[in-house]
Amino acid sequence: MQVRHNIHPDHAKQFDTAGLRKEFLIENLFIANDITLTYSHIDRIIVGGVMPVEQTVVLSPELGKQVGVAYLLERRELGLINVGGAGVVTVSGQAYEIGNQEALYIGMGNQEVSFASTDAAHPAKFYLNCAPAHTTYPTRKVTQAEARPVTLGDNATGNRRTINKYLVPDVLPTCQLVMGLTRLEEGNMWNSMPCHTHERRMEVYFYFDMTENDTVFHFMGEPQETRHLLVHNEQAVLSPSWSIHCGVGTRRYTFIWGMVGENQVFDDMDHIAIRDIR
């Protein structure tokens, strides 16, 4: 499990490209028949990926030891969205079939969790966020049809997109974790512009649905001290509460957003006027 520390904005603005990428970019999320996890001290979120191919991948007790407990979900909840082929997640003996762009919420206290692919030729890719929890809520699958969609933006400004809210209070209860998926329409390249920050939550963006020759210029930093990261397919960016988070791609793409922090109010954000960005 990699560890990333919280960075003060006065420190972050001193980084060169390599320094920014080291602290905020997560590059290699999916490894065949393995689980990759990155622990961030920003609200103590864990970001990871699981790609079972011909083997079943299990959340081992060793992962719990790395966060000071007997098993990973002893004091944590977990949300995942599948961005690959069909798969099965088994939680405490109950199997959940999770198709492409379907989600699963796993409540605190589940000790036995395993991941498998339905077809090794088209393996599942489970992208996950895991956050501290204070109580147990029921484990539940969320399909695309059950998510709460909101379409925003305009073709003229290149930001026509549909925000699909999977793990939000309107769909199911969680302790603090909120997750969803935003899909840009063809010919649109901007996300979250005009941009915002949210003082009471951190956020992680996971970009996917891109060709190997495409990229997203992800903008970050304080509104008057912006920087950028070049992000490629199936890579994630940690966004502290003080940082803007928006991007423009060489063509359309999809991204998963996950938030943890003070509240679960999706619209609790501090909007930044485009003319005020530096």
From Swiss-Prot:
Keywords: Isomerase, Metal-binding, Zinc. CDD domains: cupin_KduI_C, cupin_KduI_N. It is an enzyme of class 5 (isomerase). Pathway: Glycan metabolism; pectin degradation; 2-dehydro-3-deoxy-D-gluconate from pectin: step 4/5. Binds 1 zinc ion per subunit. Its EC number is 5.3.1.17. Its cofactor is Zn(2+). Belongs to the KduI family. This is 4-deoxy-L-threo-5-hexosulose-uronate ketol-isomerase. It comes from Tolumonas auensis (strain DSM 9187 / NBRC 110442 / TA 4).
